């Protein structure tokens, strides 16, 4: 969520004429992230986020904004797109698609504990089930075809050892994706980027018995239809990892996975290929971070992520695959 496209006060005033959101009180860019231009917007009616989409086209955008609306209507705490005066959920700003969504309650938990992982696991499963009847289809745009296109572009910037790992893992994943087992894995709309900075936590209500309360998931603009297990693997690789080493934190991983399967139990096929999917989740973000680091786009506010973090995670997942916990109730 960097700022690639600047928005002046005059630009904003013209844009806001298409919304019934009252008067603008505050407006500022959001520096984190690397894909779209994002701004916090406060009006006399509430708090919102304005996003200008730098890569998604107007033809692609309905999948994402309609998915958020669908999930919100099914009780999943996600940002709700705000309709314009013509009833549409997005328009054009500086020649690019743009939308306003509601701002969720809470703050990111960048040092999550077991209790946060339980909340995330349960809600991720609820989100997957809520998306089963979503009528639109958009593949995960950062999956195998994108990896195949991107690895040759980043190969000149990496060491020989890194290139061997990139190409070897690409071959491993291509074989996995082509298998009958992969085809049989449960699938549907996935977040595909559920890192700890894409979820918010609010204070738990008194007398609920919970120490934390999930405010919701946001930033669905990498979402796509994929295997649900991939979404789980991406989430575990961020929420349940020892940051210095990339190794899984057993307590957090166990808590998240057990919580998930109290809502949607894993299939036998998912259990067989958990290790492959952990590797796929790590590989996707190693490739994208290498690309963003070595071939960056110009931006007013941009903080590229360290590619080495997901290289460490991938090497760890190859060495130590782990297994999904057996099903039983989560405390």
From Swiss-Prot:
GO MF assignments: ATP binding; homoserine kinase activity
Known catalytic reactions: L-homoserine + ATP = O-phospho-L-homoserine + ADP + H(+)
EC number: 2.7.1.39
This protein's UniProt keywords: Amino-acid biosynthesis, ATP-binding, Kinase, Nucleotide-binding, Threonine biosynthesis, Transferase
Domain of life: Bacteria
CDD domains tied to this protein: HomoserineK_II
This protein's pathway: Amino-acid biosynthesis; L-threonine biosynthesis; L-threonine from L-aspartate: step 4/5
Top-tier EC class: transferase
One record GO biological process: threonine biosynthetic process
Gene3D superfamilies on file: 3.90.1200.10, Phosphorylase Kinase, domain 1
Coiled-coil parts of chain: none
Family: Belongs to the pseudomonas-type ThrB family.
Entry protein name: Homoserine kinase
Organism: Burkholderia pseudomallei (strain K96243)
């Amino acid at each position: 969520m960097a700022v690639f496209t600047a928005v002046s006060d005059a630009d904003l005033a013209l844009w806001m004429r298409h919304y019934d959101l009252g008067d603008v009180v505050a407006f500022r860019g959001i520096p984190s992230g690397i894909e779209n231009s994002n701004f916090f917007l406060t009006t006399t009616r509430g708090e919102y986020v304005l996003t200008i989409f730098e890569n998604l086209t107007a033809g692609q955008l309905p999948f994402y904004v309609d998915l958020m609306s669908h999930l919100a209507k099914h009780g999943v705490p996600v940002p709700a797109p705000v309709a314009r005066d013509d009833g549409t959920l997005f328009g054009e700003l500086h020649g690019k698609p743009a939308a306003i969504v509601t701002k969720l309650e809470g703050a990111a938990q960048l040092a999550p504990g077991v209790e946060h992982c339980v909340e995330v696991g349960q809600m991720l499963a609820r989100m997957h089930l809520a998306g089963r009847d979503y009528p639109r289809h958009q593949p995960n745009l950062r999956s195998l075809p994108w990896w195949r296109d991107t690895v040759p572009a980043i190969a000149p910037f990496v060491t020989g050892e890194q290139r061997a790992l990139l190409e070897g893992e690409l071959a491993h994943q291509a074989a996995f994706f082509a298998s009958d087992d992969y085809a049989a894995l449960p699938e549907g709309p996935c977040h595909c980027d559920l890192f700890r900075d894409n979820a918010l936590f609010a204070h738990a209500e008194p007398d609920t018995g919970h120490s934390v309360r999930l405010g919701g998931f946001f930033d669905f603009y990498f979402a796509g239809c994929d295997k649900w297990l991939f979404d789980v693997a991406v989430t575990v690789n961020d929420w349940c990892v020892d940051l210095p080493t990339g190794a899984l934190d057993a307590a957090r991983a166990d808590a998240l996975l057990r919580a998930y399967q109290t809502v949607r139990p894993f299939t036998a096929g998912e259990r067989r290929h958990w290790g492959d999917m952990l590797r796929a989740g790590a590989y996707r973000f190693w490739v994208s971070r290498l690309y963003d680091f070595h071939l960056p786009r110009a931006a007013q506010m941009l903080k590229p992520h360290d590619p080495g973090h997901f290289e460490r995670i991938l090497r760890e997942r190859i060495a130590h695959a782990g297994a999904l916990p057996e099903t039983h109730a989560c405390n």
